[in-house]
Amino acid sequence: MANVYDWFEERLEIQAIAEDVTSKYVPPHVNIFYCLGGITLTCFLIQFATGFAMTFYYKPTVAEAFSSVEYIMNEVNFGWLIRSIHRWSASMMVLMMILHVFRVYLTGGFKKPRELTWVSGVILAVITVSFGVTGYSLPWDQVGYWAVKIVSGVPEAIPVVGVLISDLLRGGSSVGQATLTRYYSAHTFVLPWLIAVFMLFHFLMIRKQGISGPL
């Protein structure tokens, strides 16, 4: 095993990377409230794992979406637990994100030179809410259907481009299969890639600039 480790160490400098990660200075004023961002990340990782597991059984069609969710809940081994954890973790992720935003704002963590970290965090918040909106519709039950109906109809109030935006969200002039397909694609592909990119940027900025000082 030592020879294997030495082989990788020679090429990747694992020890230097580990020392850099573990030796980062943590200011003395940091308390449990500074962990809210990390808890939000943990919730996202749980979301990713449980969501990925459900993609093996979920069917994104208006005819089979609801029955496939019922199948996950009633027939798949531990399916009820996986979906329940997905729902609970989604609520926890939003709650932790809100508390994290409040903590950063109240402690002045958005001030110079951390403006870009704040902006990327706001974008991450928007993406998180978008996850909630798109995921809410996927069971395609009465609640999900009418939620999509309302959400996709809101932009119609915007002058000139409102109808175009609504049609883009729905995939047509009315809510149907195209709408479910778009929401499913956004929830399982587009938004995960977006949040991964902005999370990476967010963490690199924090790593570079460190934790903000006390007020």
Swiss-Prot record:
Protein location: Cellular thylakoid membrane
Gene name per UniProt: petB
Organism: Desmonostoc sp. (strain PCC 7906)
CC cofactor note: Binds 2 heme b groups non-covalently with two histidine residues as axial ligands.
Keyword Transmembrane helix set for record: yes
Task of the protein: Component of the cytochrome b6-f complex, which mediates electron transfer between photosystem II (PSII) and photosystem I (PSI), cyclic electron flow around PSI, and state transitions.
Binding annotation for heme b 2: H86, H187
Entry binding sites for heme b 1: H100, H202
Lineage, broadest ranks: Bacteria, Bacillati, Cyanobacteriota, Cyanophyceae, Nostocales
Family membership: Belongs to the cytochrome b family. PetB subfamily.
Protein name per Swiss-Prot or TrEMBL: Cytochrome b6
